[in-house]
Amino acid sequence: MLQSLTVRNFKLFDEQGITIAPSKITVLIGANGSGKSSIFQALQLLKQNAETVHTGAFQYNGHELTLGSFADVIHNQATEQQVEISINVPYENLPRLEYLTPRVSRNGVYTYTINLMTGNNYSQSCTIHDDHQTYIAVKQRRRPEVTPDEFSFAEGSKIKIEATRIAGRPMEIRLTQSTDSHDNDATISDILMLLSTIQVQLSTSRFTPAIRGFDQLNYEIFSSGARFTDGNNALLRSRALANLIAERPDIAEEVGQKIQQVLGAGSRTLRNRLAGDRVSPEMGLGRKSITLFNEAFGLNQLIPAMVDLVTADQGALVAIEEPEAYLHPRAQAALADTFVEFALNEHKQVMLTTHSEHILMSLLGGVASSRLQPEDLAVYELYREGDTARAKRLAVNQYGQIEGGLREFMEVDIEKVGELVASRFR
């Protein structure tokens, strides 16, 4: 799970930057244009580059998102500066690491940092560490530095660590193995799991964009089978979703059940209809069906987010922009309850951007009822400060209260209620 994210000189964030420490559920609130989506985009950029395996040239445009160029993302277009994106991801229960010489702790944190520069250039670094010491450090400057660059184990077996120029994959290993044994295989497996910590975190992360849903009656059937499509391309995502619903009735059934919990939609089911080389996603009630294109727009918008939540791996980050889109307040509150279920029962890390007081209040209610612990819910308020944006974590107490209140988030309701009361006594 993602332990922390730091972003500097990226879009609205200046050199001071922001640091987010996600919990089981993390809520980002703030006015329009305060940088909430930029936090997701920073992570998507890392995911995009770690998966495309380009060496030496950072990709700002790809399957995840299209941001233009370095000049489009550097704060205030100050191209002499560098963007910094850094993530901390914990690893745990890798006991064979302690058989290495020098020893590496079985539990620790993998810190990865990338610095973006003009001309699609970048440098990256990483450390494997715990609270007491650093076990491995990789720095890429004019000449890569790896400390230590070699580990031994068993009798004569060695691992050489080398720095790479692949974004998101800062190091690789070369193995010299003297003998084959079960213990050696277990040691190598733990080493590979350690070195893949960042790649696994990024590759399993799911991002549900604000622009989503089915905008056609039917979609072309994939010739090579259904596959999920990440990224912010609404057409590609909706086509992939339509195919996934058709080929994976188990996923369609679970998504349908979750939607019923949110909307109170009775015994309706998520299914599909095939016509030639086209597939039409539908909601069914008995023998009757309605294409999702013609369904309630809130339902249309809800399905992509719910598919991301259902199909994500345990421990994966699922980041959803504006999950409340077109939903009734009661449905928004019920949706917050499903977020709690995914976080607690399926151990998925849920992160939201939202303007919905109903979602936030429902999550705070989960803390008040002891369903969530205060540390399970992280609430960050993003706000403008001149030409930059800041992020402030709002403390949640055991009663589900935000210490200091939520005036900035709730002030419109407060003002309008005040106006209503005042008008009553004119």
Model-derived features with residue positions:
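Pre-Walker A-like glycine/lysine-rich segment at the N-terminus of P-loop NTPase domains
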Residues: 1-51, 55-73
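Phosphate-coordinating catalytic segments in nucleotide- and nucleic-acid-processing enzymes
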Residues: 4, 50-302, 313, 397-426
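Helical "lid/switch" subdomain of P-loop NTPase nucleotide-binding domains
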Residues: 9, 17-18, 331, 356-359
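Phosphate-binding P-loop
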Residues: 17-23, 309-314, 342-345
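C-terminal lobe/lid and adjacent interdomain/linker elements of RecA-like ASCE P-loop ATPase modules
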Residues: 74-77, 333-426
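ABC ATPase nucleotide-binding domain "signature" loop
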Residues: 325-329
